[in-house]
């Protein structure tokens, strides 16, 4: 490993080993039956599984599986219906390289960027690290539409959710101000609409996941994001050219396990 500031930067082989050991890639925690269910729901265009994207044409479950084999590395056997599923760590590494290269471009151009997450439990610290690197490189980190509120369906009744920021990172919070998991593209749509209404320039790049990335990509904004093996919409979005980069990885392991990933990305992007 090499040093970058106070971080230890793994080389490619070391990071690959870490991805497999931590189950960020390789044999991941998400079971096959959950993946197949999500593939089917996305193919049926269930809004909760589209992440704000509007795919072209018809996507049958077998078509979604084929994309997920190629772009994520899930088990290709269509008769494998339950149990262990996988993410190819080499596809993760390739995705991280493309992700870092797009961040490097943003830094060179000093772009206007929104950094956001629908997975605050696992990924908020990672995104804070990326946002700090972009800020230090001269990018403008946008924080629009704070306190914009909407209702989300819930089994026990609609729940209020609002846009808030943890440092420069956008999140959705509940009525107590606690960050919450979300697939919704409504927050990024509200942000983009608010910027347009005030005549402010739209972001050059959105860095995120779930509906933050999908909704931005659907709106024509360059969008890069992490996506789990049960998040087929972002990979379909990448297949169709709406999502610039979809990195296959488990998006909800313990936060400290993403530190080597952040160090690698920042180093490759020249932001460390």
Please annotate each region the language model reported.
Residues 2-112, 117, 122-129:
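Electropositive, gly/pro-rich neighborhoods at or near active sites that engage anionic ligands
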Residues 111, 139-140, 221:
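Short phosphate-binding/catalytic loops that engage adenosine nucleotides
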Residues 123-129, 154, 214-219, 234-237:
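A short acidic (Asp/Glu
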Residues 188-217:
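Internal active-site segments that recognize and position negatively charged phosphoryl groups
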């Amino acid at each position: 490993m090499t040093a970058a500031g106070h971080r230890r930067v793994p080389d490619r082989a070391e990071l690959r080993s870490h991805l497999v050991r931590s189950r960020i890639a390789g044999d991941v925690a998400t079971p096959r039956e959950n993946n197949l269910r999500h593939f089917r729901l996305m193919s049926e265009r269930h809004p909760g599984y589209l992440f704000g994207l509007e795919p072209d044409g018809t996507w049958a479950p077998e078509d979604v599986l084929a994309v997920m084999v190629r772009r994520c590395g899930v088990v290709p056997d269509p008769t494998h219906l339950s149990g262990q599923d996988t993410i190819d760590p080499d596809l993760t590494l390739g995705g991280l390289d493309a992700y870092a290269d797009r961040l490097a471009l943003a830094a060179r151009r000093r772009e206007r960027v929104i950094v956001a997450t629908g997975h605050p439990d696992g990924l908020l610290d990672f995104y804070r690290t990326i946002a700090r690197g972009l800020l230090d490189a001269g990018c403008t980190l946008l924080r629009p539409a704070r306190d914009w509120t909407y209702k989300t369906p819930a089994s026990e009744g609609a729940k209020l959710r609002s846009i808030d920021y943890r440092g420069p990172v956008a999140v959705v919070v509940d009525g107590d101000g606690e960050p919450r998991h979300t697939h919704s593209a409504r927050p990024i749509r509200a942000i983009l609409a608010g910027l347009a209404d005030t005549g402010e320039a739209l972001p050059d790049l959105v860095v995120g996941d779930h509906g933050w990335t999908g909704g931005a990509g659907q709106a024509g904004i360059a969008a890069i994001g992490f996506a789990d093996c049960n998040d087929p919409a972002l990979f379909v979005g990448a297949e169709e050219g709406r999502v610039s980069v979809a990195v296959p990885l488990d998006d909800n392991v313990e936060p400290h396990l993403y530190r080597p990933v952040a160090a690698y990305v920042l180093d490759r992007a020249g932001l460390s």
